């Protein structure tokens, strides 16, 4: 229910209570009304309601009611900033609660008073306010602890405690006591979590996150905000969730991650904010994030390191980084700007500005000495400009003061500043210097204050000002130079819709971007199609509904390009009014053609004049170097022989207007004023849905060139008029029209439906014979006035009849022959060198534009005869891309179903279908490969006149005998299949016969990628190679490959969306339900270097999609999946996923029910690899898995795949001596081959004495530093043999530092053998002999004697669980403290006197001593205590 509706209902109920004289009900309704008003921010109205509640409660003698009313009034006053009035009413609340001995209400009163003092601290920053707040909160907490037990519910008590602890934490935050603050807030979080108090948990996490953010602890802040966001989501509180997204976005902005910040801030904006100020703050940060993404993307596309473009981008990025507080990246940007400026030899004035930016940024980073360096460099560059020098000296003085420099140093800076100010002659500047100087002197307690103040007073009196009179500074606050952001301009992406799940009924005004992102095969949106078809109403509707104006198709054309190309003047004007880029050069395939170039190339002069008057550049050049004037002259030169006087006059007027614009005599007409917006819709339209200016690889058919203007067939065929308005509007296509390219509706029917068909293929105008060889067009300075001269076209006399005949035949032939002949002809006129044969023009002449009639029908004898003949009407119809031909053309080329566009004679005069240019991507049937053109087959065309599919009728001279015809028709073609090898997988991909001719290499890449994704869970971007040669994506498949031929696919990159999205897709692909805990882990640990799902007991079905999602997580260094149910079947999948993580250092799969069989399966997958599967893995934990014996070879194979492995843990894996009786040497070689193994843990495996001996023979003792062999004996009679161990330790080069032999039934004799090794094994610093009850004081004496002989201390000795008893000799006690730094004993065998003697001997040490003695433990340490 909305607040307005709730208020109306409460007011209605209040009126009813008043009419019935129900005072108690009326007071209750006043209370509710006041709360609603306060929630909406109308605190004055809330105060009035609570005043009425107070009056009614006093009449009713309701003390608690009066107390509550006073509390509410006080809270409203506090929100309004009237602290005095707030405290007055809150103290009344406290007194009333005490008068009736209501402990709960007294507690609330004290908490409210404390909160009010916190409000006061925000404004006055007074320690006294904090002290009052602390006192109130502590007294309130004491009441909760002492007086409320049993009187209120436990949940309420927990709620009160959580809130009071949070408030106290905020108090100590203000007192600058971070540890107490953190402890209290964490206590609040714990209580809230334990009792499921979502609102309090949200508030505590949010406050703690804000504190971490303020202290620069970004990762902790992010974690807190994520937790508070989850609470808000559970509470279905969209405003609170929006606040969390906003805070996360601000952190990401502060880190300079604009892309991630934009995603978070977009979610915040979509969810909305309760207060207008909060919404404006979100919009401001959102704008910064969008701008940052755009600048970073543009900067990534800059190819030249030192260029003007790089210079401008660096400055903009630096300024933006400063705005969002990311000063470290701002420094990098400004330093790049400085390097560019110096390389480009920029003047000193510009270099000085950059030094100012660097100095200010260093000041923000508190690196004042670096700031002073840049100010000094600025000073050198400002020579001769006293005003700027003065500003620099003042800035230097501020930095020097921050550096705590002496007053003499500051006086030097201020004196220099004052001298510069006097040179400038600006009294205002002199007064400013003196004011700042005086303030600095007062802060430092200088004795010169009086002199400076006298000089300032003298200067003020001279100008008629008082000393205390403030002056406006010259500097103005920085104003954001963007327009106000309108909510309707925001474009939501699909991911945002998913993030808003659960709020579909709560969030108003949400729009789906899918409706604007639907494109046809050419990448055209619905707006493109509306502009092409001239449907002004549809264009207006789409723009009003929020369709982006500057969206591009796959080639790069915008809707403005299309409307200019088709000459729709009203649409052009409307698009310009709505922010269309009038100078957009198009995409990479568009040849730098602006809308003005485009419309001039088509002869739409009225549109061209409109563009010029609306600010279109007349100096910009396309990729051929042509200006708009060059384009106009080229068009005139091409068609001058067919123009009527009226058209020539229009051409002349357009030329004059362009020349006036070149001289600056044209005043630009601005668009009609509209409500300004902060962000253009194209800015907020996601880049993943709106095609970028430069596209690496279009996702659909490759860009194809636009047809250029048509050449009239002959001068005699020109009609009397030429129209500049659209004449080819078409009705909306039905589904069959879209699929089969039906274009049979009349374009001349004025009553036809003009609504939009977003997937209709475009039609070109009728084609004419090719133009004559163009002559060189005069330059801009020497254009003759030929527009009024009537010219005639005379064919060249030197051309023989044979050449004329060949040209005619080429024009009538197939697309292949026409284009091939054209590629051999002379290049068209250009003011720049001719383009190579392999290059493609963005505009293609319409006589080469084939539209839907691109198929060369050379399989006519394979087509069966139709039972019904094609109608006479259809047989005589022309395609949209063919010109009028004589009867020989119809006899040679089979007729097709074509458009019923007008067959009137071609013309360039008004009232006719004028020639126009068609886009590259509107050639649906061919791909240009240098000079070779491959024609593709096309789906049959359906007409509205007949329900039957019309096929071309075979010509009479190729008719086949009926029997032969039937045999061919009955023949079933062999299947077409391609074999694609992607890494270690080979896919057999069938090619449908119906699409075989149209399939390209890109299609095959896509099919292979989808199959690889289904198998491995990764979506690659592939390129194909055949015998070492790279296949282009645009290559026709059957032209480069044969059926059953195998090609090698190389992975160019991987499609890796954020981890939560990958997990969601993996669940969909595997058909399993998402696990909420795993989804939460993915969200929290997406950008983390560690992913941990330990202890979740996840089933294989829940783990499988997670493992798929984690593949190729390049930043991952730690993967911990312990205590789950991975099992043998899923282990190979997990290992395969881990092998795709190039930086993985730690892999923990302990306690996952893995057996030796699973390990064998996993190792088999890596045997065939030529490179190590885990090149960076350092730690592998397989503990607590029932591996058993018999998999030594598999372990050796796995270790061979980890060349950097240094730590291996096989604790409690059910191993015995048989584990090493086979393939032991193989395992030993795998461990020793790399020389990196440092730590091995085989504890809690029943190895016995035999296994113990085999382990020591297998392990690489020459490099091992940590060895854990605790509890490996099988019984009291099977003790491990110490002789081999002592022999290894006695070798001089043994690097072992930590040895654990606990729980192995060792005796004093075993310890004696170890003690003899101590003098010859100096590296051993830690020895764990705990849980060996047969070790007594004798063993301890042996160790001490060995240490005395070694003349070195032992860092750690653990004898807990051993029978070390007293009495201990005096020399033994002294030796203990001298030679053991950390000793751990079992005190059960030591009496009180022995323990005291031991502690006293330890305390005689001069170093810091830590002693812990409790129950059966006695721990003595010289260094810091071990935890």
Curated annotation (Swiss-Prot):
Compositionally biased spans, kind Low complexity: 10-21, 742-761, 899-910
Keywords assigned by UniProt, alphabetized: ANK repeat, Chromatin regulator, Chromosome, Cytoplasm, DNA damage, DNA repair, Leucine-rich repeat, Nucleus, Repeat, TPR repeat
PROSITE patterns to which the protein is assigned, alphabetical: ANK_REP_REGION (PS50297), ANK_REPEAT (PS50088), TPR (PS50005), TPR_REGION (PS50293)
Biased composition annotated in UniProt, kind: Basic and acidic residues: 871-880
Spans of repeat LRR: 1113-1137, 1141-1168, 1174-1197, 1234-1258, 1293-1316, 1321-1346, 1377-1400
SS bond partners: none
Single GO cellular component term: nuclear replication fork
Annotated region (Disordered), positions in chain: 1-21, 465-502, 692-801, 865-922, 941-961
Polar residues bias: start-end ranges: 773-783, 881-890
The TPR repeat ranges on this chain: 27-60, 67-100, 107-147, 162-195, 202-235, 242-275, 311-344, 352-385
Intracellular or extracellular location(s): Nucleus; Chromosome; Cytoplasm
Gene3D superfamilies recorded: Ankyrin repeat-containing domain, Ribonuclease Inhibitor, Tetratricopeptide repeat domain
Signal peptide span: none
BP GO annotations: double-strand break repair via homologous recombination; replication fork processing
Acidic residues: compositionally biased ranges: 469-501
Knocked-out gene: effects: Tonsl deficiency causes growth deficits, vertebral abnormalities, reduced neutrophil numbers, and death at early stages of larvae development.
Intervals holding ANK repeats: 522-551, 555-584, 591-620
Family matches, as Pfam families: Ank, Ank_2, LRR_6, TPR_12, TPR_7, TPR_8
Example of a GO MF term: histone reader activity
Presence of the UniProt keyword DNA repair in the record: yes
Protein function: Component of the MMS22L-TONSL complex, a complex that promotes homologous recombination-mediated repair of double-strand breaks (DSBs) at stalled or collapsed replication forks. The MMS22L-TONSL complex is required to maintain genome integrity during DNA replication. It mediates the assembly of RAD51 filaments on single-stranded DNA (ssDNA): the MMS22L-TONSL complex is recruited to DSBs following histone replacement by histone chaperones and eviction of the replication protein A complex (RPA/RP-A) from DSBs.
PANTHER family on file: TONSOKU-LIKE PROTEIN (PTHR46358:SF1)
Family: Belongs to the Tonsoku family.
Subunit structure: Component of the MMS22L-TONSL complex. Binds histones, with a strong preference for histone H3.1 (histones H3.1 and H3-4/H3.1t).
Protein name: Tonsoku-like protein
Origin species: Danio rerio
Gene: tonsl
